[in-house]
């Protein structure tokens, strides 16, 4: 049976089951602990800001039953402001096409879909800011790489069915 989870940082609690808008979860950390199944939906409250939070999902929907991350309610899109959190390690195993492209090291992503398939992420605002330094390049070797969304296919072969809309 498909489940819908609600997340509202203002009225929620991570001790709630999150299965109704009246008893939502409070944080994305609680969402990261969920075991999402095909057809499940996670809805973030519009107008909410998830500061220093991130989504790291290792889940698979099905072609006819994707897992969906979206918004509910009225107001502006919910904002995930990772602010350098959401760390994961990348290693492509070899240098890439440009010396400025970091191929090994830690990355911060507001949303990480790791070995995921048939997942839709839509109607969210994603930020992952860093204080800018004049003259500093985006991909300096000593600077943490930050992304809004990262999709990684590593241990399960080619992944498909990833949909990103209105981000």
Language-model-detected regions and their locations in the chain:
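Acidic Gly/Asp/Thr-rich repetitive segments characteristic of extracellular carbohydrate-active
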Residues: 7-45, 51
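Surface-exposed loop/turn segments connecting beta-strands in extracellular beta-rich domains
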Residues: 51-53, 106, 119, 128-130, ...
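Short, T/G/N/S-enriched strand-turn elements that build extracellular solenoid repeat scaffolds
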Residues: 29-35, 50-61, 79-82
């Amino acid at each position: 049976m498909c489940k819908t989870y609600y997340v509202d940082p203002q009225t929620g609690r991570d001790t709630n089951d999150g299965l109704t808008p009246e008893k939502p979860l409070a944080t994305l950390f609680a969402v990261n602990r969920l075991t999402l199944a095909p057809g499940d939906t996670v809805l973030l409250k519009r107008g909410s800001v998830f500061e220093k939070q991130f989504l790291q999902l290792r889940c698979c929907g099905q072609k006819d039953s994707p897992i969906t991350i979206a918004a509910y309610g009225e107001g502006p899109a919910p904002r995930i402001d990772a602010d350098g959190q959401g760390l994961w390690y990348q290693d492509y195993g070899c240098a890439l096409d440009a010396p400025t492209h970091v191929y090994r090291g830690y990355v911060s992503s507001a949303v990480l879909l790791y070995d995921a398939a048939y997942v839709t992420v839509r109607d969210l605002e994603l930020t992952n800011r860093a204080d800018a330094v004049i003259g500093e390049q985006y991909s300096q070797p000593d600077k943490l790489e930050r992304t809004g969304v990262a999709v990684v296919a590593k241990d399960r072969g080619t992944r498909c069915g990833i949909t990103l809309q209105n981000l």
